[in-house]
Amino acid sequence: MVREEVAGSTQTLQWKCVESRVDSKRLYYGRFILSPLRKGQADTVGIALRRALLGETEGTCITHAKFGSVPHEYSTIAGIEESVQEILLNLKEIVLRSNLYGVRTASICVKGPRYITAQDIILPPSVEIVDTAQPIANLTEPTDFRIELRIKRDRGYHTEVRKNTQDGSYPIDAVSMPVRNVNYSIFACGNGNAKYEILFLEIWTNGSLTPKEALYEASRNLIDLFLPFLHTEEEGTRFQENKNRFTSPLLSFQKRLTNLKKNKKRIPLNCIFIDQLELPSRTYNCLKRANIHTLLDLLSKTEEDLMRIDSFRMQDGKQIWDTLEKHLPMDLPKNKF
């Protein structure tokens, strides 16, 4: 049987930081590239990284403030220009850098008249302030001013219901998002069968992480999410002593082909290569381009997965199932293609 040779990139994926700058203490910028990627891969990687950078990257922020006997957050404190609510909003904007886990405490204890900035916060050793000039309040009179703060490392945006409190403790809507913005773009290169894509990724952070550090963390988080799928044991799969063999309930399209075999005879699906099915060369090459090499790979795909393969046609799907009916003792659903 003659097989058509399909050209493809054999180069190793490489990434590089092509631009890095500090626009201000609270605005870092980085631009990265990843290449070479096959058609469609750049979009897949770009979407996943953008979501992980914005939603999964951890940050440290102030989550609570305790002023003493203050009746409510709209109160004013004698000798202070700002209301309690304005001070809470200023504390919310403080950018912290740390590697702590759990909750830590901090405090502010000063005497007026003077401006209070982030530099006046007394922090635990594991925490530092990115921009010490960030304003907090203005003391207009020679009064003592003290705030107890709670600091926590987390991810995302968290709000808490404000309850009437007698001890002057107020929650702060915590924004644990060190990545301010992420953009990605795709550039197509090459021609013919040698086409490939380059992914450009732009990251802006608040200074608590550099863009490169944020990219590392987001990548690790994505890897951790997919690791369970690499484990040998899978729910619903009955493995025998030979891990390459399992019974037929999962030899199907995920939802539609739930009972492919009439009998309970076991088939070593990952030992049957698509080369052995004597498929037409066009269909064979479509499957190979999609990294489908064995019967197990093939039967793990849904109809929608196959139709998304580049150049895959309805006739190719029909040919595949006609071949499976011919070679395997399966009860395949009719008119699937």
UniProtKB/Swiss-Prot annotation:
Describe the protein's quaternary organization and the partners it interacts with.
Answer: In plastids the minimal PEP RNA polymerase catalytic core is composed of four subunits: alpha, beta, beta', and beta''. When a (nuclear-encoded) sigma factor is associated with the core the holoenzyme is formed, which can initiate transcription.
Q: Which UniProt keywords apply?
A: Chloroplast, DNA-directed RNA polymerase, Nucleotidyltransferase, Plastid, Transcription, Transferase
List the SMART domains: RPOLD
Residue ranges, annotated region (Alpha C-terminal domain (alpha-CTD))? 264-337
What's said on domains?
A: The N-terminal domain is essential for RNAP assembly and basal transcription, whereas the C-terminal domain is involved in interaction with transcriptional regulators and with upstream promoter elements.
User: Where does the protein end up?
Assistant: Plastid, Chloroplast
- Its source organism is Oryza sativa subsp. japonica
- Respond yes or no to whether keyword Oxidoreductase is given for this record: no
Which residue windows are transmembrane per the record? Answer: none
Functional summary from the UniProt entry: DNA-dependent RNA polymerase catalyzes the transcription of DNA into RNA using the four ribonucleoside triphosphates as substrates.
Q: Which HAMAP family match?
A: RNApol_bact_RpoA
Question: Could you tell me what reaction this enzyme catalyses?
Answer: RNA(n) + a ribonucleoside 5'-triphosphate = RNA(n+1) + diphosphate
GO CC list:
chloroplast; DNA-directed RNA polymerase complex; mitochondrion; plastid
**Where is this protein primarily located?**
plastid
What name goes with this protein?
Answer: DNA-directed RNA polymerase subunit alpha
Q: Show the taxonomic lineage.
A: Eukaryota, Viridiplantae, Streptophyta, Embryophyta, Tracheophyta
The region called Alpha N-terminal domain (alpha-NTD) is annotated at: 1-233
Q: Does the keyword Lyase apply?
A: no
For this UniProt entry, the molecular function terms from Gene Ontology, in alphabetical order, are: DNA binding; DNA-directed RNA polymerase activity; protein dimerization activity
